[in-house]
Amino acid sequence: SSVEPRSLSAYVWSFAAKPKGKNLVHHNVFFNQDYSDEFKKISSGRISEDPTLYVCAQEQSIKNNKNQRYEIIINAPPVSLNKISDKEEYDLCKEITFQKLKKMGLTFHPEPTTKNLTTPANFETLCPGADGSLYGLNPQKMMSTFQRPTTKTKIKGLYLTGGGVHPGPGLPMAALSGKHAAEMIKKDLALT
């Protein structure tokens, strides 16, 4: 039996800094010029030179002179498709991310370092066997949504929840998956 291809992974910068330039809201997306090209690059094992960047300004509503927490997410290939070394990966990711933000009018001080970057390989270490994938099986196939594991398993007392389980990826769907699991457990244990 063949192994089904995995969905996207990501490079995630998590850091505290002072922003300069563009005013941010809590959720910010900096789109690229060619969205389909970004995914062609990812499917060939590389990140785009012009990736879409998601920037979460976690403490945007708190006005102070201290460093504030940020998270920047860049789509990436799963580990099995990744074609570059760890050192190359870090250097490339840093250059691409912060040069693009600078062009868009946003800089951070201090700029993050290696310790602030979580890579697809780090996600694979955290969740062995997932290939660094964040969303389970590759959702590009027509029936992939219906092939996700369901909440209840064949093993008594084992229930699944999360973005790789029905109904699918993303925080709202993962939360809904958790709700489904809780309802199934209550039903199976005859709790009210």
Summary of predicted features, one role per range:
Residues 15, 72, 101, 158, ...:
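Hydrophobic, well-ordered secondary-structure elements that form the walls
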Residues 16-18, 64-100:
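Conserved FAD/dinucleotide-binding core of flavoprotein oxidoreductases
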Residues 54, 107-167:
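A glycine-rich dinucleotide-binding beta-alpha-beta segment and adjacent secondary-structure elements
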Residues 61-67, 149-154:
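Short glycine/proline-enriched loop/turn "hinge" motifs that connect secondary-structure elements
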